[in-house]
């Protein structure tokens, strides 16, 4: 196994021009698979509520629920660095995610003062901010977050021009989730979306790296046919 990923290792990757690979995962098996694939960051997102638990929005996920998810992912990700979202952005919640959840970094959508408070407590911060504004304004915000102590930036909806400008303006890695691109220091993608796992991909022509949902549907349909026909099911003895 290669060396454990650290904040310092991620920052060195930026200096050397090596792209950082991130995925969002919510359970131990997916974290284990991501680890074996060589992913650098496994992020536990509050997106678990809408994409895995069937909630209407991500706002229904509580901190206590995220703690359980973070613990599960941490058990699976041995090499990759594990980050976890903070629903509130508060220092007390950040401490719980680290102390109880096992997070090695916390991701927060909050202004520089909140980032500074968390970073000052010795907790690495993955600071999220969004595009759709003048490039100069985005560069200034990125610099403020870096100065406040952010270890990484998650720049959503960056666009190539603003994204490239922010990457050049700060020393810390700039990762792109939604609306990112190759102009950033790395990318973040939901593992379920990358492999096409979920009912939303069963009837979709969206491009993915696999169609695991369709494979699962076919496999479970075949299993149901075997049971109803009185045949021995695959993988079970006795």
Q: Model segments located where?
A:
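Alpha/beta enzyme core
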Residues: 2-238
């Amino acid at each position: 196994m290669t060396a454990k990923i650290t904040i310092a290792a991620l920052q060195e990757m930026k200096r050397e021009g090596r792209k950082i690979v991130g995925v969002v995962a919510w359970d131990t098996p997916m974290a284990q698979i991501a680890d074996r694939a060589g992913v650098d960051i496994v992020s536990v997102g509050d997106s678990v509520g809408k994409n895995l638990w069937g909630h209407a929005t991500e706002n229904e996920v509580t901190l206590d629920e995220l703690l359980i998810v973070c613990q599960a992912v941490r058990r699976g990700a041995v090499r990759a660095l594990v980050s976890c979202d903070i629903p509130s952005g508060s220092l007390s919640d950040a401490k719980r995610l680290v102390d109880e959840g096992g997070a090695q970094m916390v991701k927060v959508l909050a202004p520089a003062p909140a980032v500074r408070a968390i970073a000052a407590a010795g907790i690495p911060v993955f600071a999220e901010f969004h595009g759709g504004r003048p490039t100069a304004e985005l560069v200034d915000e990125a610099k403020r977050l870096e100065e406040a102590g952010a270890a990484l930036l998650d720049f959503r909806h960056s666009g190539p021009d603003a994204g490239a400008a922010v990457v050049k303006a700060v020393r810390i890695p700039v990762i792109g989730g939604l609306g990112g691109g190759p102009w950033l220091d790395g990318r973040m993608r939901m593992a379920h979306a990358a492999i096409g796992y979920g009912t939303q991909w069963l009837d979709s022509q969206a491009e993915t790296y696999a169609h695991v949902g369709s494979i699962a549907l076919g496999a479970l349909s075949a299993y149901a046919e075997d049971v109803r026909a009185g045949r021995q099911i695959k993988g079970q003895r006795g």
